[in-house]
Amino acid sequence: MKSTSKESYNWAAGSYIDLFIVSAVTQIFFAIGLYWTFASDTSWVNEAPVLQSNIRILAIGTLPVLGWVMALVIGIGFDRFPLDYKSAPFDPSLISTIAALNIGGQILIIVGILTSQIESLESLAQMGATLLGAQVILLGPISWRLYKSRSPEDNVNVRMWGIGSMLALPVVGVITILSWILVHNDWFYILFWTVILDGFWLMVTFALILAHFQDRLGWKLMGPEENGRAFAIFVFLVIIHIILEFLHQSGDITDSYVKASISAPILWIFFVSRPDRIWKNVLAGEKCSSQILSAHSWLLATAAIGIYEAIYIEEAIGMFYTRLMLIFGVVVQTVWGSSVYLHEDHNHIEIENRKSRLISVIMIFIMMAGIIYLALNAGGHVTIFNPEIVATIAVVALFIAASDFFIWLVSDAIFNHDNWHRIPMYYTNMHKDSVTDDDYFPNESE
């Protein structure tokens, strides 16, 4: 085998730490903003004109999907893609630039939320969203070079899901900026949610789920051909969903039931990931990330609420409860679990010795149960508890889960470097026979 120059991509391993720290800090601020929006002063959203409510929902939604969750995913990408594709077409200054744009954009939006004034929020969020959009646009050329440098053998377990996530980044950035520049245009509001959350983030989430169970743990979920077909069908379902949303917005389709199309790609990735095989391994005692397993399990409930919301809930701000569940119950849990697993790989902790993140999983369970109750309450089927109290409990549960992640990351990543290695254990142990001439894969820890 041809030897790969160590200098070509060796330095990129372990480059995720700065972005993880940015995420850990800003998600605490986000939880405060979430409480301020939905629990402290619910009239700010519920009793506001539809357009103003849309702006507030868009602001609180931009923070995770382009801010602190995106920081974690970009950090994972900076660490893993050079290992997967044996190429690092970027330098350390880019990582610092991404971190600065990310935290700067989030701070501007959070300050706008805390002002409780729609004019201030709009102007500050436009500036913040521009910074957040710019960070992913900058990754476009790098993503293309990584895509062009790959070989057919690279990343076969994730394949198009990872490639598609990379190549979609500039599109996500452009749509984000346009959605805030044209924030009074309902078409771009719909475009933001359908493309970025329902499409892009669902794709990223499945890439991480597949990377964990099939690539990292070696559980056989699907072959390369099945992988390609699954991706093609997913893209088709997302496109159909986007078209139906726009036809409903234009009035060409008046039946709100078409909004249930959001559940189609969610159900698809749930069943195509073979939950029977996942749970067969879990019940057999095989270890995995409890957070990623929990996120995968919540896909089914999220899809069910999507159908329920389309049928029973009349609201003008989109599939609010479904997307809330998708962001926090599925996307955030998957990204948290992937982040923890990657960091523990860098600490060379054996899988059987890793701690379960039960506090986070339980808090997300409480939050998701609260969202489901609020959806059923809005649909007129459950009226047992005061919805404002339930909303407060859900936000507090999310705050505790975010705090748990923050405490873990600070204590483990900032103050404890005793067992940290630049090369994660997964890569130091894989393919030893085929890469013995490559200095990048040592046979001993560094």
Regions found by a protein language model. Give the residues of each.
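Hydrophobic alpha-helical transmembrane segments of multi-pass integral membrane proteins
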Residues: 1-446
